[in-house]
């Protein structure tokens, strides 16, 4: 069964929803200028409200290595998701400094993009359509099996995520806008998304 990450949490209500619905991961966006941006102090407060059983993933775009490492070491986040131009040396250094799992986002337009994603020295490639377009990429590029576990993102909803899990068996599906109403996390949509993905295991 694919795991579930709900990204872009930014309020105590969001955390309350997560604590009740128990996704496998949640995400805090530290990239300035993004709609769902949270400051370090805000994230620390939200992490303190979040169930210890749910790992928090920090989303970064070209942040100084030391800052990302500090957030991991302090326990504000348990995993790092890199969305900028971070090279292999950056990722390897972060891994060596913290031992934490690392995700690296890749925009998928071709088989070559997939090859680059799966050869990059991260724990999990995150396959996406780009900068929060809310649309899926061409899933026909994917196969049933992959060289390493990956997170599938971009345009996922309660309607299409179960199909993606059934067809491609990603390690995890990553959703943000697909569980929102008017730019805010929607409890009903979060619950429906999680139930739809997890029901696959009981139906098969």
Place the predicted regions along the sequence by residue:
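Conserved N-terminal beta1-alpha1 strand-loop-helix module at the mouth
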Residues: 1-127, 131-204
């Amino acid at each position: 069964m694919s795991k579930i990450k709900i990204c872009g949490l930014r309020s105590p209500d969001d955390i309350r929803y997560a604590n009740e619905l128990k996704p496998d991961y949640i995400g805090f966006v530290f990239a300035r200028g993004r709609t769902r941006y949270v400051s370090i102090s805000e994230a620390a407060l939200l992490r303190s409200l979040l169930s210890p059983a749910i790992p928090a993933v920090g989303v970064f775009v070209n942040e100084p290595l030391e800052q990302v490492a500090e957030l991991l070491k302090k326990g504000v986040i348990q995993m790092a998701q890199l969305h900028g131009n971070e090279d292999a040396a950056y990722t390897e250094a972060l891994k060596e400094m913290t031992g934490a799992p690392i995700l690296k986002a890749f925009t998928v337009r071709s088989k070559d993009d997939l090859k680059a994603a799966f050869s990059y020295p991260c724990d999990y490639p995150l396959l996406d359509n780009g900068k929060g377009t809310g649309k899926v990429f061409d899933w026909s590029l994917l196969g049933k099996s992959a060289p390493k576990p990956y997170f599938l993102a971009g345009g996922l909803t309660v309607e299409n995520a179960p199909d993606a899990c059934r067809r491609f068996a990603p390690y995890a599906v990553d959703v943000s806008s697909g569980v929102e109403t008017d730019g805010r996390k929607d409890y009903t949509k979060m619950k429906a998304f999680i139930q739809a993905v997890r029901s696959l295991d009981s139906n098969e």
